[in-house]
Amino acid sequence: MKKIEFTLALVAAICFCRATSISAWEDDRFRFHFRTVNFPGDTFTQLLGINDSGTIAGYHGAAVNKGFAFTFPNDFDLENFPNSAQTQVIGINNRGYTDGFYIDNAGTNHGFLDINGTFTTVDFPGTTLNQLLGLNNLEQAAGYYADAAGIDHPYIFDHNGGVFLVITIPAAVGGAQATGINDNGSISGFYIDSKGTNHGFVIAKGRFQTLDFPGSTLTQAFGLNNHDEVVGQYVDASGLTHGFIFDDGRFTSVDDPEGVGTTTINGINDRRQIVGFFVTAGGNTNGFVGSE
């Protein structure tokens, strides 16, 4: 199995970033209508990826994770790696192929691809913890492995040939994860610096750009579409969590109206539909879909 490694130098990115806090929610660029999606009979559902047909990858169960693919109005197609103890389905492409990770009966995390109903384990050679977090239409998956010291290392796995592309970020002293890849080869993710601070990033057209939502204490990018619109979460100075969209050099804050201050956006498709989850006042985790 081939391994390719390259090093990206950090580039100081100059952008004029506009931060907007919106609840019900619109600005001059976006207007979303939110729908809550919960797995029947469960109080914990996360929606993590969405393709252009509106099929959604996710999982339910706080204690024991079980994966699914969801289509409206209420069709949950259960998807779990065979004989696994737990499964999270995270990325989905326009063919309906998915990726994610599963935990085996020994408690080990493995990445996986589900290509037309055929499951394949994806583990970086010599490692014991892998997760795949995003998948494009070329069957390239974004993910990471953890080394023996517990430090995460981001990579891209190309299913066509089984090639791993390792991404080395000099500032990522505390580790990094690749969370999404689009058909143009742009990559989203986040890294942890020497002070333990989380920063989002996007690699587009060979340029590495750090993403820090203005005034935040933590920023993590979780996905992107073919327009290089990036989504994720940030934590504000009060410790509240909000979703964001980064587009054309500008940030916009996004909260599901039912989960203001507890919202995470994990996926976005080319129709600018977003998926994620929020936590209710009662402690339940609800999935959501936002459409313009």
Regions found by a protein language model. Give the residues of each.
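Bacterial N-terminal signal peptides that target proteins for export
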Residues: M1-L8
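Residue-level hotspots at or immediately adjacent to binding/recognition sites across diverse folds
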Residues: I22-E292
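C-terminal segment of classical bacterial N-terminal signal peptides
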Residues: I14-S21
